[in-house]
A protein has these predicted regions:
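Cys/His-rich short segments
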Residues: 153-215, 227
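Gly/charged, well-structured mid-domain segments that form the phosphate/adenylate-handling core
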Residues: 197, 210-212, 243-279, 283
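Glycine/aspartate-rich loop-and-adjacent alpha/beta segment that forms the canonical ThDP
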Residues: 382-403
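Active-site beta-alpha connecting loops in nucleotide-dependent enzymes
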Residues: 264, 282-361, 399-402
């Protein structure tokens, strides 16, 4: 890895954070390619050491030579210990820090400590940080690296959920933070009434944000438009834009890139199967799941929903986080059906029962999908956690190819 990464001609980006890494990293890669650059990228989201090594090996020729101007590498937070000792990133994009996989990461402070230790080992690495996240912003300020910020300075949507908020207390002094508004989870405009810690000035500020059938916002007098749903995708797009601009590009081809961008990795991936529109998305922690639900419920037409929950090692065995998700938001009139599947389908069904949401149980994921395509309303959303993602995507690709 050290040998191959040293052959990157210009700069190396790493993308870290709890949610949005894969989408942000792939958009960043596509944006750099739109600027005419050759880029190495771990597109599938394989973000531990083996996945990072594989991205560089697959990008190399048989001679061991790498032909790349840039590298865009998504890195699992805990894996930075192994990756940062072998490559020297020029930029780090920090998306957010939420509670995730408690039995693997433990408390969020452990993740922050790992990141800070590794960031300090690369003191000249510039951090492109979500300034609306008090945890990420504190980390960027505290580690001593140069940093720029991106964020959304005005409230966009009314925050009605009773979400678990991770960054409630000031990391500097322990005082409870005061928020003038929340976007979602702990993202918003915050300040500490005791020590003065506050949301930093935002360098890349999204204004006039619209989140309807598509996303639109203005940054640096440039109107950005993307055919995506979900408020959280404003942050993903904004992070990629901030990365490209920080690297010195004018981002003149950014909207063109967004029009052509196709994730093809189970993140908001769309399929058309026998007349049914299918959207597959990853939901692996409370903050991410709540944003997924909000995006699904933006669609006012009747819909079927399949939720697939596993508890394999990569998911985390502890699925108590399901009780911190606002599943009561699925109580709208336009829900035709909800089916639960996966290893922990019984737990998922119980969780829905506690908020009076009726559901059907089908242990086999393919059977569940075939049933909804066969007798559903023609509009299907499939929400899965990590180890269910690739198997479910393969099923959907297979069904899409059937005549």
């Amino acid at each position: 890895l050290e040998e191959l990464s040293s052959q990157v001609r210009e700069k190396i980006f790493v993308v870290c954070g709890t949610n949005g890494k894969t989408t942000t990293n792939n958009m960043l890669c596509a944006g750099l390619e739109a600027e005419g650059k050759k880029v190495i990228c771990n597109h599938t989201g394989s973000n531990m050491l083996n996945g990072v090594v594989a991205a560089f090996v697959l990008g190399a020729k048989f001679s061991g030579k790498l032909d790349a101007d840039y590298a865009c590498i998504e890195v699992d937070e805990a894996s930075t210990r192994h990756v940062f000792t072998r490559i020297r990133p020029d930029y780090m994009v920090m998306t957010n820090l939420f509670r995730d996989q408690l039995d693997r990461y433990g408390e969020i402070d452990i993740t922050m400590n790992i990141l800070e230790e590794m960031m300090k080992k690369v003191p000249d690495m510039k951090v492109i940080v979500n300034g609306d996240d008090a945890l990420s912003a504190y980390l960027a300020m505290d580690c001593g690296n140069p940093f720029v910020t991106y964020g959304i300075s005005k409230p966009v949507i009314e925050n009605k959920t009773n979400e678990i908020r991770e960054g409630r207390f000031c990391k500097c002094c322990g005082e409870r933070l005061i928020y003038s508004f929340y976007h979602y989870s702990q993202l918003g405009d915050y300040r500490c009434p005791k020590c003065g810690f506050k949301r930093p000035e935002i360098d890349f500020d999204a204004t006039d944000v619209k989140v309807d059938d598509q996303i639109a916002f203005t940054v640096e007098d440039k109107r950005i438009v993307a055919n995506y749903k979900g408020f959280y995708n404003v942050y993903n797009i904004l992070a990629a834009y901030a990365g490209i601009r920080t690297a010195g590009f004018k981002a003149e081809h950014f909207n063109e890139m967004l029009r052509k961008f196709n994730p093809e990795n189970g993140r908001n991936e769309q399929f058309r199967i026998k007349g049914t529109s299918v959207v597959l998305n990853l939901a692996k922690n409370p903050a991410g799941f709540n944003q997924n639900i909000s995006a699904v419920m933006q669609d006012g037409s009747p819909k079927d929903i399949i939720i697939v929950i596993n508890d394999n090692a990569q998911d985390g065995k502890d699925i108590s986080w399901l009780w911190d998700v606002d599943f009561d938001l699925f109580g709208g009139d336009n829900i035709n059906s909800i089916t639960v599947s996966g290893i922990r389908c019984q737990d998922m069904r119980l969780r829905l029962k506690y908020v009076d949401i009726p559901s059907m149980l089908e242990n086999d994921v393919e059977t569940a999908i075939r049933k909804r395509i066969g007798d559903g309303c023609g509009n299907l959303y499939v929400l899965v956690n990590y180890t269910a993602l690739f198997g479910t995507r393969n099923i959907l690709k297979k069904l899409e190819g059937e005549k």
